[in-house]
Amino acid sequence: MLRIAKEALTFDDVLLVPAHSTVLPNTADLSTQLTKTIRLNIPMLSAAMDTVTEARLAIALAQEGGIGFIHKNMSIERQAEEVRRVKKHESGVVTDPQTVLPTTTLREVKELTERNGFAGYPVVTEENELVGIITGRDVRFVTDLNQPVSVYMTPKERLVTVREGEAREVVLAKMHEKRVEKALVVDDEFHLIGMITVKDFQKAERKPNACKDEQGRLRVGAAVGAGAGNEERVDALVAAGVDVLLIDSSHGHSEGVLQRIRETRAKYPDLQIIGGNVATAAGARALAEAGCSAVKVGIGPGSICTTRIVTGVGVPQITAVADAVEALEGTGIPVIADGGIRFSGDIAKAIAAGASAVMVGSMLAGTEESPGEIELYQGRSYKSYRGMGSLGAMSKGSSDRYFQSDNAADKLVPEGIEGRVAYKGRLKEIIHQQMGGLRSCMGLTGCGTIDELRTKAEFVRISGAGIQESHVHDVTITKESPNYRLGS
């Protein structure tokens, strides 16, 4: 007898039922819990894939209210540096600003500027006492780069200094009065504590919805493998200030993965850890018991994933999410739906099935901010996109995600493909369209918050004819819509 557990459904098998509503789409609250302690302003995460998320995309997504996960197909030092780039991009108060000594040469300062991408450095003594600041304006026309900083720096008498905790309005007024772009935070002994820049104030005003930590820095996540030898990578990422760690595997309900989570939790009791991927209630429970702060669901739904075809294993995504959510009821541990999201309606369906947020790859892979070059093919612009189970990605370092250790291409068994997606422009436009669709869903279903959508919205199951009727039919599309693309 066939051991068939049950029937399982995915996004195209269901629709949400409209309900009486007092909710206007533009008043819907899209904020949600990523973990018990991290709140997002939109329920969107970017996948930890080498053609999707590095610092540039993570910054752009955090500014829109979501969070990006830096992929691990790079050296430990580089991944930690990518995390630092995000954390320092928009800092509020930079608590550990890079400083120079009065004896530092201008040539060394120039090298620092080229490496870091910014030109203002507080000048401190060996005892961390503030004596001045050197900026790009101070040295713009200097030709002798062997001179020490002390010759050209702005001395401390002319600096704008503030005490810790000073009101934003006071700081801005002082900066405006002296016509400067940087204010230095000092204690009573004039020791440097931090630095505030006008640019950070401007960025905060431009992006009020940004996802930030308590210190006003953008939030960022990073992925690590579950295999042995990843301890050093975890330590480096924690030291770099990562907000949430993703212990990433194609099969999270595996003893090796669970053990890695237990060990990481024991070493870092307060670190936010996401574990995955699973597709069953038992898998979700196992991750929660191992110490996960959130559980990621999805075995094989992604556009570039061939796991279900190569292995014959997987659970359609709506059922997988609903089962995981039911298993974690009462624990306060959120579920993340990872993969298979093609339209904003799929985001709404995943959340209505119980997910607190969705992780997307192909949706963001063709954006300006994603890694990789724009390619021209038959007159259209594309960007490359590949699964972390593809031969190319596995030979670069992601093979441990699929429990394979031999990096010779002819010995690897891929569970993903390499392809291309249409170039989509800037990430913020994609987010605007996707979140706009989600807001419209919340208006139609009468759900004012993500939590209400998770718990109140009802589904109907539809037939093949129902999905055919739902899509564009009996017409030729002459102008592409920004939120509806079939194929690529």
Swiss-Prot record:
Pathway: Purine metabolism; XMP biosynthesis via de novo pathway; XMP from IMP: step 1/1. Gene3D superfamilies: Aldolase class I (3.20.20.70). Disulfide bonds: none annotated. NAD(+) binds at residues 248-250, 298-300. The keyword NAD applies. Homotetramer. Residues 93-149, 153-214 form the CBS domain. K(+) binds at residues 300, 302, 305, 469-471. Changing residue 469 to A: Increases the value of Km for K(+) by 17-fold. Keywords: Acetylation, CBS domain, GMP biosynthesis, Metal-binding, NAD, Oxidoreductase, Potassium, Purine biosynthesis, Repeat. This is Inosine-5'-monophosphate dehydrogenase. The active site is at 305 (thioimidate intermediate), 401 (proton acceptor). It catalyses: IMP + NAD(+) + H2O = XMP + NADH + H(+). One of its GO terms (cellular component) is protein-containing complex. The CBS domain of IMPDH is a negative trans-regulator of adenylate nucleotide synthesis, and this role is independent of the catalytic function of IMPDH in the de novo GMP biosynthesis. Deletion of the CBS domain derepresses the synthesis of AMP from IMP. It comes from Escherichia coli (strain K12). Its EC number is 1.1.1.205. Pfam families: CBS (PF00571), IMPDH (PF00478). SUPFAM superfamilies: CBS-domain pair, Inosine monophosphate dehydrogenase (IMPDH). Catalyzes the conversion of inosine 5'-phosphate (IMP) to xanthosine 5'-phosphate (XMP), the first committed and rate-limiting step in the de novo synthesis of guanine nucleotides, and therefore plays an important role in the regulation of cell growth. Its cofactor is K(+).
